[in-house]
A protein has these predicted regions:
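Short beta-strands and strand-coil junctions in structured, solvent-facing domains, enriched
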Residues: 98-99, 216-217, 254-256, 270-271, ...
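Bacterial Sec-pathway N-terminal export signals of envelope proteins
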Residues: 1-47, 92-114, 120-127, 173, ...
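Acidic, low-complexity, intrinsically disordered peripheral segments
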Residues: 4, 19-21, 205-235, 241, ...
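Small/polar, glycine/serine/threonine/aspartate-rich low-complexity segments that form flexible
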Residues: 14-90, 94, 225-238, 269-274, ...
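Amphipathic alpha-helical coiled-coil segments
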Residues: 1-3, 126-152, 160-162, 167, ...
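Acidic, glycine-rich loop-and-beta core segments that form the ion-binding/anion-interacting portion
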Residues: 171-238, 242-270
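Hydrophobic, small-residue-rich alpha-helical packing segments that form membrane-like cores
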Residues: 84-97, 101-191, 196-205, 209-212
Length: 446
């Protein structure tokens, strides 16, 4: 706002007053001849001055100024009571070589406006990144909760098998070695369950802190969210990798910031080159005095004075300016390389997220098959165990493998969903509204 304010009329006003008292021994010849004494004389007066002005800075480098001045003197002693002088002065100055041109004069204003645009783009990017961060943290809490539930279900299944095998042991159908293996498996599953509870509570507390809540506050997580992402979370974006990289280059606001900064550095080169030119300034001045009768506020336009001049300055020591010019050239090259590096990093991020989604989708397919296989293994092991024909090791392995496969299945769903959110974010196609809801891509919404 200040840079814009500089190009509006700026008004000024000033004033001041002084009181003066002078005393001096003035020898008066006649009085000395009569009395032989000197006479003490004193003078008192009040001086006041006022000034009103306006200044308008032109975007071409020139400046227009208008000032109205008044000087007023009032004598408190003597015959003359008061005197006053004033003038209306108008001036125009315009650089003709150095500092000439709107691109030079308005550089600070343009840079300030572009810096504001950069901050708006950065804030938009931050909103997208923060939304993905909150969603990722939320899904991680859901994953830890589902892991805890799976470990608890596995513990119940192990305890049920242990009770059955202990009953067989009491009948002499199982040995202590066989039952001990199942007891050890139950203890390990209990340990995994308690550890998963700790991780779940810690992740939930971290999520509260991220939302600005206190860790001791209670919040309820939506149980339907995991079902929802399980049903829709494995959908793939409707575009290929080449299209994704092209979209990222075209839509990423932070990449536009990098490109615009290259243009900023190019302008700085022109400004630095202009600073090495000689100084040649044109000045036009008009002065209208007040009327000779001494009345304030009356101007004598017939006796106005006009003047014009050129002020030339030939720079002989340009070491500092030449260093600034070289620095501007270097900054331009740095900005260009940073822009190209940002473009490569954006493409690399898109490729990495594309691979993560594919890997998560492949993991999902493998883990889904693994869950189905281990469910059949557990079912068969339970049937054989109930008939007294089962093997303890088969029972332990099938149940542990089922619990691990169920946890890995949920983990692959969460990982794919988070990767997809980050993918849309890095493509610049994740839109966040004022309520915090986001829209992915074109037709996918949340």
């Amino acid at each position: 706002t200040f840079d814009r304010y500089r190009y509006t009329p700026v008004f000024s006003a000033s004033g001041g007053a002084d009181y003066q008292w002078d005393a001096e021994d003035q020898f008066v010849t006649d009085m000395q001849a009569l009395t032989g004494m000197s006479v003490l004389s004193a003078s008192e007066r009040v001086d006041a001055s006022t000034s009103l002005g306006a200044r308008y800075l032109l975007k071409g480098g020139g400046a227009i100024a208008l000032n109205l001045t008044n000087n007023f003197t009032r004598f408190l002693t003597g015959d003359v009571s008061e005197l006053g002088t004033g003038a209306l002065i108008g001036s125009f100055t315009q650089p003709l070589l150095r500092d000439f041109g709107s691109y030079i004069e308005t550089e600070n204003l343009m840079q300030a406006e572009r810096d504001l645009l950069y901050r708006l783009r950065d804030f938009t990017r931050f909103r997208k990144t923060f939304a993905v961060r909150v969603a990722s943290s939320y899904y991680s809490v859901l994953l830890n909760r589902e892991t805890t539930r799976n470990n608890y279900a596995g513990l119940l299944a192990n305890n049920l098998s242990l009770e059955r095998e202990q009953a067989f042991q009491a009948e002499g159908l199982r040995t202590l070695l066989q039952v001990g293996r199942l007891e050890q498996s139950s203890l390990q599953q209990d340990l995994r369950w308690t550890s998963s509870i700790t991780r779940y509570k810690r992740s939930l507390d971290d999520f509260k802190i991220l939302l600005g809540l206190k860790a001791e506050e209670n919040i309820a997580l939506d149980d339907n969210e995991m079902i929802l992402i399980s049903e829709t979370g494995m959908d793939s974006p409707d575009l290929n990798l080449e299209q994704a990289m092209d979209l990222a280059v075209q839509t990423r606001l932070d990449l536009y910031n990098g490109l615009d900064r290259v243009q900023d550095r190019a302008r700085k080169i022109e400004v630095a080159a202009n600073a090495m030119k000689p100084g040649l300034d044109l000045s036009l001045v008009a002065r209208v005095p007040d009327a000779n009768d001494g009345d304030l506020g009356e101007l004598d336009f017939e006796n106005a004075l006009y003047s014009a001049g050129l002020d030339f300055e030939l720079p002989l020591d340009t070491k500092l300016d030449r260093n600034s010019y070289r620095r501007a050239l270097i900054d331009y090259e740095v900005a260009t390389r940073n822009y190209l590096l940002d473009m490569d990093n954006i493409k690399l991020d898109v490729v990495d997220l594309w691979r993560r989604m594919n890997q998560a989708r492949k993991n999902y397919e493998i883990n889904l098959t693994s869950v189905q296989i281990n469910e059949r293994r557990v079912e068969e092991a339970e049937l054989r165990a109930e008939l007294g024909l089962g093997d303890i090791q088969d029972t332990v392995d099938s149940q542990n493998d089922l619990t691990a496969a169920q946890t890995d299945l949920i983990s692959s769903i969460v990982d794919h969903n988070i990767s997809k959110l980050e993918f849309w974010r890095d493509l610049g196609l994740l839109y966040v509204d004022d309520s915090g809801q986001w829209e992915e891509g074109v037709n996918e919404s949340r």
